[in-house]
Amino acid sequence: MAKDEDNSRVHLLDLPWEDVLVPHILSYLPLRHILSLQRVSKPFHSLVHIYLCNCRHFDSTQLGPQLPKTTFSELLKNNTVLQKLDLQSCSDWLTDKELLPIIGQNHHLTYINLNSCGQLTRQSLVAISLSCPHLQNICLGHCDWVDCLSMRSLADHCKCLEAIDLTACRQLKDDAISYLVQKSTRLKSLSLAVNANISDIAVEETAKSCRDLEHLDLTGCLRVKNDSIRTLAEYCNNLKSLKVKHCHNVTESSLGNLRKREVVLDVEPPLQRALVLLQDVVGFAPFINLQI
């Protein structure tokens, strides 16, 4: 009787692997927990292998900053169906050698995060542009190696771009950004923050080319002035947020219209800013009757 009951039990691994376990169970577990299953038994090791070959999203932050490069390469060497790839926690060691094979065999990527991956070269971005025609969102923040040539390649080949983060990509100048936005008219989110090379020229071209723009980050773009912000207000009716902190030449005369449209700004109106400064100095904010 006991033997019959044991034979009638359904074990986890008895369920269809590719139709049930991988898409409906493993896909909801943190990656580090999935990898730990490899140590349970040989069947579980095989199951995890199938998962890694078929997973659509790979987020290195789920494994922490200690992910060895050999482990990383082994995990993804047989995957050809990735759609989202987040490698920001690999920034200490990721080079073209590790990235290029993965990019070369995954042509369905729509999201790539290479934030602070400073050891890559332009070769990686060129490879992305040639291998990932469906790319929609790419983060290249603090990647000093991004230059005009690699940016032109991205603009020429990735026609579906909707969001790009170029924070602190200091090799880029107005001409590179202008070329990018002329080719990427679907852009909804763009960060050009912390780049002293960016001026009104790039911002005005962005406004005129990307009419559906919703989010623009110009933090620390010291050469940006009121004229380009007015152009932005004129052409980008869908704008939802604008960051201009530390843009000392951008004043309320250009921000006022955006504020009236309830665009989220990261700088306070002049009166509120003055009250905050006064509070910092004297330790309290005076009561002011604003209705007078």
UniProtKB/Swiss-Prot annotation:
LRR repeat ranges, renumbered to this chain: 134-155, 160-181, 186-207, 212-233, 238-259
Pathway note: Protein modification; protein ubiquitination
Keywords: Cytoplasm, Leucine-rich repeat, Repeat, Ubl conjugation pathway
Keyword Transport found: no
UniProt subcellular location: Cytoplasm
Top-level taxon in the UniProt lineage: Eukaryota
Similarity comment: Belongs to the FBXL15 family.
Function: Substrate recognition component of a SCF (SKP1-CUL1-F-box protein) E3 ubiquitin-protein ligase complex which mediates the ubiquitination and subsequent proteasomal degradation of target proteins. Acts as a positive regulator of the BMP signaling pathway. Required for dorsal/ventral pattern formation.
PANTHER family, sorted: F-BOX_LRR-REPEAT PROTEIN 15, PARTNER OF PAIRED, ISOFORM B-RELATED
Name of this protein: F-box/LRR-repeat protein 15
Natural source organism: Xenopus laevis
